[in-house]
């Protein structure tokens, strides 16, 4: 077994240094800059993304139907009570998702890259499918904290461990600007797996999304900061507990993330917020 796979299975995450070079990173920054520049604010509701307030979790059709689209989600501190931006739009965004890997050629190139393919071959994935992609801004001064969580709360598969995230640092991620923190080995505990973010399947005008089960609490002293350099990435097991603090620095902490499931002998939950459509099926990482 390779060191990469051994460390990943031991800790639930692994850092892989210098996967993408400066040119590849600058191409991504250029692509996201153009996407933001071309965004017409009038065409997009100012959905605020927060993982702290369960009832504010962008529980609307804009979020629900974003699996094969490029959609925009704003920082809490960037939208006032009247729904107006308090900062320029390029500094107001929390994230863009969830179909960058489908619709933008630069993001598609980074996603279906031979280097990413080799990583998933290295951890034994036979039929990896890319289920979502996000560009996370973590803006200077207002970049919100992401509370402790496991990715399988939001994207549930059976078997539950057939989900892996890839977190690519587009900027250097340091303690000061809100790098990720992990509880090493926490992916081995499935006792809190009843907590989920699901579709309600409501047709009466009620909430479209909700959290079910008991929200787990974690020993904060067990978290370890994992700073990484620009162009490096973190491979993240779907059950490992992680979080990030608010960005109180004057430096951005951009990241591009994808989530990949092992399709072989795996069931994608029909209650997941994110679903395939008649037009869109999750693409195979190895066949693009």
Curated annotation (Swiss-Prot):
UniProt-listed SUPFAM superfamilies: Clavaminate synthase-like
Cofactor: Fe cation
Protein family per UniProt: Belongs to the PhyH family. PHYHD1 subfamily.
Annotated Fe cation binding sites: 149, 151, 242
Organism whose genome encodes this protein: Caenorhabditis briggsae
Enzyme Commission number: 1.-.-.-
GO molecular function: dioxygenase activity; metal ion binding
Pfam family, one: PhyH
Keyword field contains Cell inner membrane: no
Binding, 2-oxoglutarate: 95, 134, 149-151, 167, 244, 253
Domain of life (superkingdom): Eukaryota
The protein's name in its UniProt record: Phytanoyl-CoA dioxygenase domain-containing protein 1 homolog
Keyword tags: Dioxygenase, Iron, Metal-binding, Oxidoreductase
Function: Has alpha-ketoglutarate-dependent dioxygenase activity. Does not show detectable activity towards fatty acid CoA thioesters. Is not expected to be active with phytanoyl CoA.
Alphabetical list of Gene3D superfamilies matching this protein: q2cbj1_9rhob like domain
Record-linked InterPro entries: Phytyl_CoA_dOase-like (IPR008775)
Phosphoprotein in keyword set: no
